[in-house]
Amino acid sequence: MMTEQLPKLEAGEYPGGIWYYEPHTYQPYRYVLGRVGKHPLVCIGINPSTAQPGALDPTLKSVERLANANGFDSWIMFNVYPQRATDPNDMDKTPDRALCDENIRWLKAVLAETEPTMWAAWGTLIEKRDYLPGLMREMVALTREKNIPW
């Protein structure tokens, strides 16, 4: 049985400091955005907005504030679906399975390389697309396999 080759979570220097940011340049999708640390609060939302290192949106400013207030050394934002859309109504009507699979690979990498605590932050937006609950269950199952706390 072959072992899955996971991507390497690498920190880079961006405006405002050292960040995790995948992909490393602005794209119409985003897998990972967060501060570097060993014990992050990993927040899972529905889909990414335009936020990037050094230019956080109000949601990510709240994630950062909550992580700091609760003693985490860092935070990482993931999303159930990685397509960037400032309005969830603009998300793909059907999921791009390649994006979904890569999103899961990056979550596996974060779980393997850090000691996270998870935070479910998808709310009722999970109902925006029929495919979102299934993708969310895939992500939750990964954390349960590794006994990651929520």
Label the model's feature ranges:
Residues 40, 73-74, 149:
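Residues at the starts of beta-strands that form the adenosine-phosphate
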Residues 73-89:
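Short connector loops at secondary-structure junctions
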